[in-house]
Structure formats: structure tokens, C-alpha cells
Amino acid sequence: MAGASGSSVVKGIKGMLLDLSGTLHIDNVVTPNAVEALQRLRGAGVKIRFVTNSTKTSDERLYSKLTGLGFELDRNEIFTSLGAAKTLVRQRGYRPLLLLEDEALEQFADIDQSEPHTAVVVGLAPSKFDYQHMNRAFQALLGGADLVGIHKARYYAQQEDKLAMGPGGFVAALEYATDKKAMLVGKPARQFYELALRDMGMLETPEVVAMVGDDVLADLGGGARELGLVRLLVRTGKYRPGDEAGPQVQAQPDGVFDTFADIVEAVVTR
């Protein structure tokens, strides 16, 4: 197995939380041998859930995309930050102003979005990050609305060799302008990981569950570290050399591998 460090930490793994974009695929391209690796992982009896901060499209469209790429998975195995945001909106009875792309807005079609808005929900919405939309959000926040950041990633892998801005900078801009702190519902919020762990029946044994991702902060920081998950970084997607020891990293990953397939190789041959 090439390009792996920390191979020994996977020996006791019985469950795995998998990031999607940048880890299993980059846009419409599957990372090396990821489809076959997922099948091998299932064959080894490892429990799997997919945890993603993808917010540009609805959960149903995301599921269709993944199956179209060749991945075999159940719709109920996918936990999205978009879904977590909708749950929060429902629980609190918010009438949200949604800074989301049109395909993601589909998921909120049954939610009352009338004014006055009681929350501003921000996801990855490149077409909405202009002055008009941001100022409308600013005005709603000044009027008393809560700020909900679906996640706060700084950037994502648009292509293997090209990064693009994530929603984090835009959430931070609204925080700065209004002196409000955003509630974050996706990775790395602890409660987001707990949703998936509970569904797996492994909330009480996080030490035998690995979190796999390409972002040392958004995937492997925060709640992943607090819960004691085995944190495994892949050198695909948004990963750049030295990420694992960056200035904002509070604890380095437990292992670093070239690809998701390399992690699976280490798990099934342990």
C-alpha cells in the first residue's frame, strides 16, 4: 500500500463515516478505485454512513448522482448538513431566508418562507453571494433573525487541481457585519456526527469508528475529535501538502492515506 501513514490505527475499525466530495468523488469523477473499495468495505462487515456538507443540491439529487457514479448505497445511509438544517428549521419553527442554490431549495419547498424571516440559512450558493442577496440577509439579521450556517468550510475541490471558495467566508462576513454568531449544523458540529453514530448503533463506541475525509478541519476537527473518532485524512480532493499540520489544526489526524481505497486496503487486510 503506497503513501499511507498510521495504517495500524485501522485494525480495530468496525464502523466508518465517509465524506463524499473530495473523498469518494470530485464533481463527476470517482476517486481511484473508490467504487470497488466501498464494496470491499461492506464485504468486510464494516458499518458505513455517508456524512456530507454538500449543500448545492437536494438530498434526493445527491443520492441519484452517487448511484449514477456507480456507488451502491442506501438512501438512508446518507446524512447531509442540508437535511440537518431543515430539521433545525422545523424544530424551531423558523421562517427562513435561504441563501441556497435552486436545486437545494427544492428540499425546503414545504417550509414557510414568508416574511418577516426569523432565520437566515446559508449554504454553498455561488449564485446568491452577491451584494443584493447578502444585504437582504444582513437586513433580516438586523431585524432579529438567527444566523444558521449549514457549514463553514473555507473552500472545496471544484476539480482535482482547482479549489473554489466555500460558504465559510460569507457566513463570517454576516457574523462580522451583525455581531451575531452563526449556529453551525454540519461538520464538524458534534451533533451532526452523533446523528450518524446513533443510526449505526455505535454512539457508545466511537473509538472503533473512523471518520474519513479530505479536510482536516471540516471533516476531522471539532466533533470528530471531541467524540474520539479515528480520524483519517485522504490526499485527494481539497487536500494540499502540509494540511495535516496546519496552523489551525488542534490535533493531527490519526492516519494519512493517499486515497479512500488505500484505507480500505488497510482495513480488510488487517
For the regions a language model picked out, list residue spans one by one.
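Asp-based, Mg2+/Mn2+-dependent phosphohydrolase catalytic module
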Residues: 1-20, 26-44, 55-79, 83-270
